[in-house]
Each structure stands twice: as C-alpha cells, then as structure tokens.
Curated annotation (Swiss-Prot):
Protein name: Tail attachment protein
Keyword tRNA processing: no
GO cellular component, one term: viral capsid
Gene3D superfamilies with a match to the protein in the record: Phage tail proteins
Species for this entry: Enterobacteria phage P21
Function (record text): Is needed for attachment of the tail to the head.
InterPro entries per UniProt: Phage_Head-Tail_Connect_sf
Superkingdom classification of source: Viruses
Keyword terms, alphabetized: Capsid protein, Virion
Subcellular location: Virion
Amino acid sequence: MRDFQNAFDAALAGVDSTIVEVMGISAQFTSGAQRGGEVHGVFDDPESLGFASSGI
C-alpha cells in the first residue's frame, strides 16, 4: 500500500481518477490569465457552470 496510512486512503486514491474520468466534464477558461486553458473535473451542477463576466 505505497505511502498510505490505511486501506481506506489507498482505495480512495485508486478510484479518484476513475471517477473524474467517467463522470467528469471539461470546462474552458474564457477570460483571465488562463484564457484558453481547460480543466477536467466533476462539478455539482455542470449545466450552470459559470463565473462573473470579468473572468476568474
């Protein structure tokens, strides 16, 4: 179990990337310093993902 203190931590680390891969969506930065960049993750409400018009 690599550097984990218990089996629960090891199990969570193993499934985390799978959850993001299967359930995740991509969001693109449309303004600010990271304009054009992309992040992939699991969002609570992906249909209303947005930020202030001035960017993030």
